[in-house]
Amino acid sequence: RHSAQSIETQSTSSEELVPSPPSPLPPPRVYKPCFVCQDKSSGYHYGVSACEGCKGFFRRSIQKNMIYTCHRDKNCVINKVTRNRCQYCRLQRCFEVGMSKESVRNDRNKKKKEPIKQECIESLEMTAELDDLTEKIRKAHQETFPSLCQLGKYTTNS
C-alpha cells in the first residue's frame, strides 16, 4: 500500500519550469559583546570581540601614536555610555582586554595614494601580436556561433 504522501518530480518540459524561491539567508553572526565597552560587537577586531566605535578608536590611536591623559584616577568606568569621556582609560581598557597593537596596519592609506608605476601601465598595453590573436579568436567564435553574433547587442564587433 502507498503512503498518503505523494512525491512530486520536476518536469523537464521548459514550459513547466518554475524558478525556485531564493534560498533563505543564513542567520546573522552573533558575537560576544564588545570586550571594551559591552556595546554590540561587529566582529573580532585586533584580536578581540569589539564594536565599530572601539575598533575605530583603537586603530586611530595606534596609527596616530596618540598619548592621552586621564583627568581622574586612571580607573574610569568604560561602557557604551561613558566610553567617550576618557580616552586614556578607554585605550588602557583596549590593551587590558587583549587588543593587539601589532594587528593595526599602518599602510592601508598609503597604498591608495601611491601613483601607478609606469611599468604596470606599459604591461597593460596590447601588443600588435596580442591584438591580432584577439581578432582571430573573435572571428573563429563568430564562425562557430553565427546565431549568437546576429543578436548584435551581445557582441562588441558585429
Curated annotation (Swiss-Prot):
Origin: domain of life: Eukaryota
Ranges for region Disordered: 1-24
Keyword terms of this UniProt record: DNA-binding, Metal-binding, Nucleus, Receptor, Transcription, Transcription regulation, Zinc, Zinc-finger
Known DNA-binding region: 31-106
A GO CC term assigned to this protein in UniProt: transcription regulator complex
SUPFAM superfamilies: Glucocorticoid receptor-like (DNA-binding domain)
Cystines in this chain: none
Annotated signal peptide: none
Keyword Iron-sulfur: no
Molecular function as annotated in GO: nuclear glucocorticoid receptor binding; nuclear receptor activity; RNA polymerase II cis-regulatory region sequence-specific DNA binding; zinc ion binding
Domain notes: Composed of three domains: a modulating N-terminal domain, a DNA-binding domain and a C-terminal ligand-binding domain.
Record protein name field: Retinoic acid receptor beta
